[in-house]
């Protein structure tokens, strides 16, 4: 069977529903609109049956769809940051004096993969200040520390091993991970933020399966945030072929031999054929928008502000920005 590459739970549900024409048992889907035009979708995987069908662990997956032109409007960016913060706060159940460790996963030398390190560079880190100047830093300020550990190819160390060692050394009560994801659809690239309480597997979206970073491996809750920055080239080619076939079917005379041939094409077999034809030439080619540099900069700011607001509930965004400046 042709498996479409995606890290988004909302897309996994869509693929299953399209393939089997029914909802998944053990999965609850809820959609709402906040701040007038920001769509928030909750996908709750409740049991092993749902997890197997979705190909994802049991837990909650929140998808926030960013409005068009958000990257060019500071006001909308702040609105999305507050929606991200609200979604995080629903998943974070942590007293304000407890420590949070934020991990920016990814390769800072590769723009589509640099979202994690970029977010870390915009965070309000306070753990060191709470120790160095306890009289100046208010008790309501949460101790937050952050790291961008790089990738195995740069460090020679599994990212999961680095994080596990840090957790054992500094004893945080929560880990928040940020990583780049792969999407099924081009229109979701850099236009969607996924938040989950199930942890993350670095590099899984592009086929690099590393050590899992989750509560089971670290012993503390792990919240994962991700933004799709790439799409599999084979998926784009397959979608283009689907559009061509659909248009040819619409223009063909119903009941005629050519119409029947087009209508009986197995789309699953077609997807597998396209994948096998492209593999010798492009391998696992991933495609990203040409404006990815600007997109990563703005999305990282949105996510960083969302994390800052969620981890520092006693501060407003204006005060956080003053602190950072």
From Swiss-Prot:
SUPFAM superfamilies hit by this protein: HybD-like (SSF53163)
Signal peptide (UniProt feature, chain positions): none
Superkingdom, natural source: Bacteria
Post-translation changes: Autoproteolytically processed. The inactive tetrameric zymogen termed p46 autoprocesses to a smaller form termed p41, which is active only during spore germination.
EC numbers: 3.4.24.78
Cleaved propeptide residues: 1-7
GO biological process, one term: proteolysis
InterPro entries: Pept_HybD-like_dom_sf, Peptidase_A25
Leading EC class: hydrolase
Keywords: Hydrolase, Protease, Zymogen
Reactions that this protein is recorded to catalyse: Endopeptidase action with P4 Glu or Asp, P1 preferably Glu > Asp, P1' hydrophobic and P2' Ala
Gene Ontology MF: a single term: metalloendopeptidase activity
Function statement: Initiates the rapid degradation of small, acid-soluble proteins during spore germination.
Subunit structure, interactors included: Homotetramer.
Similarity comment: family membership: Belongs to the peptidase A25 family.
NCBIfam families: GPR (TIGR01441)
Protein name: Germination protease
